[in-house]
Swiss-Prot record:
Task of the protein: Involved in the degradation of galactose via the DeLey-Doudoroff pathway. Catalyzes the oxidation of galactose in the presence of NAD(+). Uses NAD(+) as a hydrogen acceptor more efficiently than NADP(+).
Gene behind this protein: galD
Cited Gene3D superfamilies: NAD(P)-binding Rossmann-like Domain
Molecular-function GO term, any one: oxidoreductase activity
Positions of the catalytic residues: 163 (proton acceptor)
EC code(s) of this entry: 1.1.1.-
Cited SUPFAM superfamilies: NAD(P)-binding Rossmann-fold domains
One Pfam family it belongs to: adh_short_C2
Keywords tagged on the record: NAD, Oxidoreductase
Binding-site residues for substrate, renumbered to this chain: 150
Broadest EC class assigned to this enzyme: oxidoreductase
Protein name: Probable galactose dehydrogenase GalD
Family, similarity comment: Belongs to the short-chain dehydrogenases/reductases (SDR) family.
Disruption phenotype: Cells lacking this gene fail to grow on galactose as sole carbon source.
Length: 256
């Protein structure tokens, strides 16, 4: 599948910060915003794939995104990444909180350490990144925050209790922040992807059989990929959704 061709003129020259942008869904979003003419920075812990993405996007658009290497489990690193993005881009009007890791772990195997690790990777940094970026958006007169959740917490999946908890928590966080930041013209929405097939998912978890089972549950009988999330994210980031906040948009091919 190729990236959607729709253009959102208001995104041109807009400062955009994407977390977890070095691969998978995040990389598709970084590329898409760059194609819209936005000024893009992204955070990732993995340097090799991130630098390769910068080269690819620069070759395609003539402008390389700014890569910030950081471990988002560290709150000070989150704050430093936000400050670096603002300094590099001049402003951040769009924040996409995408970084996550869906490790599998049985109920009996969960420890205090693994529980805290999952919430740190999948929930905590979203709040602190919003906290760091919001003052910049307030000074600019507004902005859009897009938080990536998942339909996983709606599926009764037995092997991801901590991950499901984090992804459910993102919905509560989104609604709370929308209420707090709305008076400052900052919109906060969430996207809940379904089974998005990425290279990492294929390598670690998915089989042809599991993909087929999920497609059977979907109304749309095809495999969903990262590019399927580009259009919805661009829409929420742009002024086309100017009256939309505190909402959770499910992109799952019709499971729900």
């Amino acid at each position: 599948m190729t990236l959607p061709s729709s253009q959102f003129p208001d995104l041109r020259d807009r400062g955009v910060l994407v977390t977890g942008g070095g691969s998978g869904i995040g990389a598709a979003l970084v590329e898409a915003f760059a194609r819209q003419g936005a000024r893009v920075a992204f955070v990732d812990i993995a340097a090799e794939s991130s630098l390769a993405l910068c080269e690819k996007v620069a070759a395609q658009t003539g402008q390389a995104p700014h890569f910030i290497q950081a471990d988002l489990r560290n709150v000070e690193a989150v704050r430093a990444a936000a400050d670096e993005a603002v300094a590099k881009l001049g402003s951040v009007r769009v924040l996409v909180n995408n970084a996550a890791r869906d490790d599998r772990q049985a109920l009996e195997a969960v420890t205090e350490e693994s529980w805290d690790e999952s919430l740190s990777v999948n929930l905590r940094h979203l709040f602190f990144m919003c906290q760091a970026v919001a003052p910049h958006m307030q000074r600019q007169g507004g902005g859009s925050i897009v938080n990536f959740s998942s339909i996983a917490f709606l599926l009764n999946m037995p092997e991801i209790p901590a991950y499901s908890t984090a992804k459910a928590g993102i919905i509560g966080l989104t609604k709370s922040l929308a209420g707090k930041l709305g008076p400052d013209n900052i919109r906060v929405n969430a996207i809940l992807p379904g089974m998005i097939v990425t290279e990492r998912q294929r390598r670690l978890w998915l089989t042809e059989e599991s993909i087929a089972r999920m497609q059977e549950r979907q109304c749309l009988k095809r495999m969903l990929v990262a590019d399927d999330l580009v259009g919805p994210c661009l829409f929420l980031a742009s002024d086309s959704s100017a009256a939309m906040t505190a909402q959770a948009m499910i992109i799952d091919g019709g499971v729900f």
